Amino acid sequence: MKVALMGFPLSGRTTLFDALSGGHARDGIASIPIPDPRFEALARQAGAKKITPAAFEWRDDLPDFNPDKPETARQPLSLARQSDALVCVLRAFDSPYAPYHAPIDPARDLRFWLDEYVLSDLQVIENRLERLTKLFQSHKESAADRAEHALLSRMHAALSAGESLAAFEIPSDLEARLRGFGFLTRKPMVVVANIGESLLGGEARSEMLASLQAVCTAHRLPMMSLCATFERDLRQLPESEQAEFLQMMGVAEPALPRLVRLVYEQLNLQAFYTIGDDSRAWLLRRGGTALDAAATIHSDLARGFIRAEVCHADEVLTAGGWKAAQKAGKVQLVGKDYLMRDGEVIYVRFNV
């Protein structure tokens, strides 16, 4: 799962990326494991020789652009389409050492981004509608082409009215045709207010953040505040010193795990596991089936799917391992349409 960090120059976007990656990433891309104590316990219990946690690929490789020249946003927005989720980093601190391009106003900056997403999606749809119209003129269109044109026309009307495409239901027979467009206004998004250290400790409150929260509420966007420089400095300390630093700054806990949880929730994800010498955690959209889980592991497992054995991680841990859970009758044999639950261990029976 790819998560793109969006933000103006000097918003703190790269500082946040450095905090997430520990400053060890190259080229603005970092695969960062998702904390999962349940999986860690399963891997220990199984005596795994190789342990692979689920991870998000965080990206801070989008080109900067000049906020005074919106046309320069075209390339970064085009690259953002390739991501699964967006994290919009907004500057909510002032500093003479990092002069900003305008007075500090995160609500204004968020509205700018939201408008750019709408305009960018409009351009994508207009280009596609133009190609479909030419196809119609040659009388070579299919029924699917006509259905796509009708749906895109409705989407165009919504975007022209300033609405996002988040609420649009795309028929299953058109999903594959539209997936490559990567509509920005349909992507899960988390808003991050990058505050100064003076607002650390307790719940950050200011008139500026209240205005930002109002915009987020109107657009049904989750918002959190953090201080990217503080998170980066905390991450660079030895673990033995981090608790003391948090206490000294009056901060209950690091903010980064909360950011990861928010992105996880916005992507509507759940985890499942394969355990043994090679133990792995996998990500699956909620509502995914046993067949979807098999396909996530390897296409051959889905192609030759016969049945799957599943058992919740808690029951495996309580029983003392997979074989013990089998003996205790906790393991279920399920078909391809079985709806996976968060935290299940799976073994796929297949034949190719």
Where are these regions (language model features)?
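Conserved G1/Walker A P-loop phosphate-binding module
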Residues: M1-A102, A107, I125, L132
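Charged face of amphipathic alpha-helices used as oligomerization/assembly stalks or helix-helix interfaces
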Residues: I125-E126, S153
